[in-house]
A protein has these predicted regions:
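Non-catalytic cap/lid and distal C-terminal segments of serine-dependent acyl enzymes
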Residues: 1-181, 187
């Protein structure tokens, strides 16, 4: 098992950032089911106030013969920040995937590329997968923070116990613009 911590300059985020990657090079025998398949890539997006260290990427990587990539998304909801200029969706859906494919030769097709997340990361996984359907062939969202309708009615100075209006405004923009974040009910 190789664990790699990579730091590089991201044009989407306009700063240096880092991500972790796990590559199964000395696989244990888990029944031989995945031994002969090409290595696929799984992007895992962390939740609000987390940093990706709460997953078990080594197990996922070895058992399923996946390269696992865990980027840092701060508390961005994995969106392209309208006021900050930090484009987290673009970072994951374009820049990071290109970096992984070009540098490591992994997951050259959507069929071999999956994205998953928990809570805020689940929202980000759904949003990113639907924004880049030709990049991500599979998506898994666990306990996703699908809160755009809840916060759409929030007023300046409001708070929902997790964050305040100013934070949500920074992530999502004006409540009127939340409709562009609505996730489709079916995908063709």
């Amino acid at each position: 098992m190789s664990q790699i911590d990579i730091r590089f300059f991201s044009h989407s985020l306009n700063r240096h950032t880092s991500f972790k990657m796990y590559i199964p090079d000395d696989k244990r025998n888990y029944g031989g089911v995945y031994d002969k398949q090409n290595m696929k890539t799984l992007f895992i997006l962390h939740g609000y106030t987390q940093d990706g260290n709460n997953w078990i990427p080594e197990y996922i990587s070895e058992k399923y013969n996946f390269a696992v990539v865990i980027p840092h998304g701060e508390n961005s909801f994995w969106l392209d920040g309208l006021s900050t200029g930090h484009k987290y969706c673009t970072y994951v859906g374009e820049e990071l995937i290109d970096y992984i494919r070009n540098t490591f030769g992994l997951a050259q097709t959507a069929e071999d590329t999956a994205i998953m997340g928990y809570s805020m990361g689940g929202f980000g996984a759904l949003h990113t997968a639907f924004t880049y359907p030709d990049t991500f062939g599979k998506v898994c969202a666990m306990s996703s923070a699908l809160i755009v309708h809840e916060i759409a009615g929030m007023k300046d100075g409001g708070d929902n116990g997790v964050a305040n209006y100013a934070y949500y405004h920074e992530c999502f923009g004006n409540p009127v613009s939340y409709t562009h974040l609505t996730l489709p009910t079916n995908r063709e």
